[in-house]
From Swiss-Prot:
Cu cation binds at H286, H288, H290. Residues 62-75 have a biased composition (Basic and acidic residues). The keyword Cell membrane does not apply. It comes from Mus musculus (Mouse). Belongs to the lysyl oxidase family. GO terms for cellular component: collagen trimer; collagen-containing extracellular matrix; extracellular matrix; extracellular region; extracellular space. Its main location: secreted. This is Protein-lysine 6-oxidase. The gene is Lox. It catalyses: L-lysyl-[protein] + O2 + H2O = (S)-2-amino-6-oxohexanoyl-[protein] + H2O2 + NH4(+).
């Protein structure tokens, strides 16, 4: 019994030296994190940004030697075309193997090449290792990534962004008719110039403005508005003299005969404003420049006596190419830089804009004549002045107005 207890107590003590002397398997040190690798670089406002990653690096496929042979799984070597191989190099594996001692006597400070994980359909792993080793010997440095450039087209110093009708970056919310054609249909630089385009301000011939009588006849109507909503129009003297009395209040109403207008330049030259650019007037209410003292004049005449029954007013809107016929391109905008009307283009004024009316608050119901004159004072030379006036028959009932018989008249 005593012997059994002695064996149980002394047995573990005798095994301790044996366990200490036994060779222990060395543990591999923990893998150090791989080096950061630059993958993406871009430039913004003069600052260079880089995106670094620890992920695997994609190796593009290399061109193989056509005389190389691939070994089949059965051991026979035969010449056959090889398919591309996708290579991935892992930074963590490279750093771990570099610190592992070499069993074949290789110098410890000499790192092994990075491990590559590959996939190729139709080949065995042994043949893949041979191909990977050959590619490692002939592998060249990967090309540098191309420098990023600004994707926005270069702007011209002598051109304003708001004045280029072909600029797709132009802010055009204030005018829905601006840039309504495809902005990328820019004429080619080496092609023949279209009529009225690319000839600058020095052209042969003269402009010829012609108002559209049918456009006026189709959309003439009567509207009542309060003086509160006519404050901008009152600043530009678009109302009758009775609207400027001292006893007029904001909730008083005015009766307006509204009508649209569309003027075409059917001449061979640009219609440019009569005033120089430095003398254009800025109107803060309507947020545009007036480049002419009087572009149009509106009058309401008695049908029998041809006398003026409603006080007309001057309409000195800004000039621009609202739309053009097929084959012509817009070149002028309603800005402080360029204003005008190109040949083959139209300057359109809708009936619902300010000052596109005649104040008929003091006019009695009856038959009248609406007279719309374009370039009435002949401030800009034209090739023909006999087609600058439109006359329409107006029947006013006190609440409604009916337009008919609109034609072009020489007077």
């Amino acid at each position: 019994m005593r012997f059994a207890w002695a064996v149980l107590l002394l047995g573990p003590l005798q095994l301790c030296p044996l366990l200490r002397c036994a060779p222990q398997t060395p543990r591999e040190p923990p893998a150090a994190p791989g080096a950061w690798r630059q993958t993406i670089q871009w430039e913004n406002n003069g600052q260079v940004f880089s995106l670094l990653s620890l992920g695997a690096q994609y190796q593009p496929q290399r061109r193989r030697d056509p005389s190389a042979t691939a070994r089949r799984p059965d051991g026979d070597a035969a010449s056959q075309p090889r398919t591309p191989i996708l290579l991935l190099r892992d930074n963590r594996t490279a750093s771990t193997r570099a610190r592992t001692p070499s069993p074949s006597g290789v110098a410890a400070g000499r790192p092994r090449p990075a491990a590559r994980h590959w996939f190729q359909a139709g080949f065995s792993p042994s043949g893949a290792r041979d191909g990977a080793s050959r590619r490692a010997a002939n592998r060249t440095a990967s090309p540098q990534p191309p420098q990023l450039s600004n994707l926005r087209p270069p702007s011209h110093i002598d051109r304003m962004v708001g004045d280029d009708p072909y600029n797709p970056y132009k802010y055009s919310d204030d005018n829905p008719y601006y840039n309504y054609y495809d902005t990328y249909e820019r004429p080619r630089p080496g092609s023949r110039n279209r009529p009225g385009y690319g000839t600058g301000y020095f052209q042969y011939g003269l402009p010829d403005l012609v108002p559209d009588p049918y456009y006026i006849q189709a959309s003439t109507y009567v509207q009542k508005m309060s003086m509160y909503n006519l404050r901008c129009a009152a600043e530009e003297n678009c109302l009758a003299s009775s609207a400027y009395r001292a006893d007029v209040r904001d909730y008083d109403h005015r009766v307006l005969l509204r009508f649209p207008q569309r003027v075409k330049n059917q001449g061979t030259s640009d219609f440019l404003p009569s005033r120089p650019r430095y003398s254009w007037e800025w109107h803060s209410c309507h947020q545009h420049y007036h480049s002419m003292d009087e572009f149009s004049h509106y009058d309401l005449l008695d049908a029998n006596t041809q006398r003026r029954v409603a006080e007309g007013h001057k309409a000195s809107f800004c000039l621009e190419d609202t739309s053009c016929d097929y084959g012509y391109h817009r070149r002028f905008a309603c800005t402080a830089h360029t204003q005008g009307l190109s040949p083959g283009c139209y300057d359109t004024y809708a009936a619902d804009i300010d000052c596109q009316w005649i104040d008929i608050t003091d006019v009695q119901p009856g038959n009248y004549i609406l007279k719309v004159s374009v370039n009435p004072s002949y401030l800009v030379p034209e090739s023909d002045y006999t087609n600058n006036v439109v006359r329409c028959d107006i029947r006013y009932t006190g609440h409604h107005a009916y337009a008919s018989g609109c034609t072009i008249s020489p007077y």
